[in-house]
């Protein structure tokens, strides 16, 4: 992910260029992971065509989830009022960059591709993050908690439905699940607001729509 020195982040144009570069890196680039791929030397077992297609669909969903997480966190960080909250969000975003890279690697191994709608997923998530952040840092952190808890739940579902022999995908998802739980815990400790009931339900509905589309496209 392209880094721009803090000393340059003075003008609105500087900040706009930073956000544009982040969007391009996330959606069209191939940002490198800072940590090793959890799949490591795990053997890539042979999968039947239907199994490979299913595994690719699930990993495409997970890749989209990371695109959305990047958009959400960068949108929140752009309007965060507290430096500690901003740094918390950017640190979480860096770990999500690792997830993004790992999922992209696995999609290539499965001879598949990311979602065609990644620009839309990113833009929508960035807008949601900015709106949440404008309500206040406690609201912003509340969205982090709810997002990560919902991601944990769908990672559990994927670990149950992935082909048993697809140990490379499983290794990646297990580490992602640990990271997501930690992000949620840290956000709670930082003062996250509990979101009112309609919001988590709306987020779950949007997530279901995204997963349905991303599985195939």
UniProtKB/Swiss-Prot annotation:
What is the annotated localization of this protein?
Answer: Cell membrane
Q: Which EC class is this protein assigned? A: oxidoreductase
Q: Which UniProt keywords apply?
A: Cell membrane, Iron, Membrane, Metal-binding, Monooxygenase, Oxidoreductase, Ubiquinone biosynthesis
What is the membrane topology noted in the UniProt record heading this document? Peripheral membrane protein
Instruction: Cite the cofactor comment.
Output: Binds 2 iron ions per subunit.
Pathway named in the protein's UniProt entry: Cofactor biosynthesis; ubiquinone biosynthesis
Which cofactors, if any, are listed as required? Fe cation
GO biological process terms held by the UniProt record: ubiquinone biosynthetic process
Keyword Cell cycle appears in the UniProt entry: no
Q: Which GO terms describe its molecular function?
A: 3-demethoxyubiquinol 3-hydroxylase activity; metal ion binding
Task: List the Gene3D superfamilies.
Answer: 1.20.1260.10
Q: Where does Fe cation 1 bind?
A: 66, 96, 99, 180
Query: What GO cellular component entries does it have?
Result: plasma membrane
Under the heading SUPFAM superfamilies, the entry gives: Ferritin-like
Look up keyword Metal-binding and say if it applies. yes
Residue positions annotated to bind Fe cation 2 are 96, 148, 180, 183
- EC identifiers of the protein: 1.14.99.60
Its UniProt entry gives the catalysed reaction(s) as: a 5-methoxy-2-methyl-3-(all-trans-polyprenyl)benzene-1,4-diol + AH2 + O2 = a 3-demethylubiquinol + A + H2O
Query: What positions belong to coiled-coil segments?
Result: none
NCBIfam families with a match to the protein in the record? DMQ_monoox_COQ7
What the entry lists under PANTHER family is as follows: 5-DEMETHOXYUBIQUINONE HYDROXYLASE, MITOCHONDRIAL, COENZYME Q10 BIOSYNTHESIS PROTEIN 7
Instruction: Outline what the protein does.
Output: Catalyzes the hydroxylation of 2-nonaprenyl-3-methyl-6-methoxy-1,4-benzoquinol during ubiquinone biosynthesis.
Family listed: Belongs to the COQ7 family.
This chain's protein is named 3-demethoxyubiquinol 3-hydroxylase
Q: Which organism is it from?
A: Xanthomonas campestris pv. campestris (strain ATCC 33913 / DSM 3586 / NCPPB 528 / LMG 568 / P 25)
Lineage of the organism? Bacteria, Pseudomonadati, Pseudomonadota, Gammaproteobacteria, Lysobacterales
Q: Which gene encodes it?
A: coq7
């Amino acid at each position: 992910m392209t880094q721009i020195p803090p000393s340059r982040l003075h003008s609105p144009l500087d900040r706009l260029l930073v956000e544009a570069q982040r969007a391009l890196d996330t959606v069209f680039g191939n940002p490198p992971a800072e940590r090793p791929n959890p799949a490591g030397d795990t053997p890539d077992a042979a999968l039947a065509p239907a199994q490979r297609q299913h595994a690719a669909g699930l990993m495409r969903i997970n890749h989209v989830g990371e695109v959305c997480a990047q958009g959400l966190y960068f949108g929140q960080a752009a309007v965060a009022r507290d430096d500690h909250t901003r740094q918390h969000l950017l640190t979480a975003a860096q770990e999500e960059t690792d997830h993004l890279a790992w999922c992209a690697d696995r999609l290539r191994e499965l001879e598949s591709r990311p979602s065609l709608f990644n620009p839309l997923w990113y833009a929508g998530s960035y807008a949601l993050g900015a709106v949440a952040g404008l309500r206040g840092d406690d609201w912003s952190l509340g969205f982090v908690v709810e997002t990560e808890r919902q991601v944990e739940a769908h990672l559990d579902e994927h670990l149950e439905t992935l082909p048993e022999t697809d140990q490379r995908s499983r290794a990646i998802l297990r580490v992602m699940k640990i990271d997501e739980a930690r992000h949620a815990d840290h956000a709670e400790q930082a003062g996250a607001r509990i979101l009112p009931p309609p919001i988590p339900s709306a987020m779950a509905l949007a997530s279901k729509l995204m997963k349905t589309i991303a599985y195939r496209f």
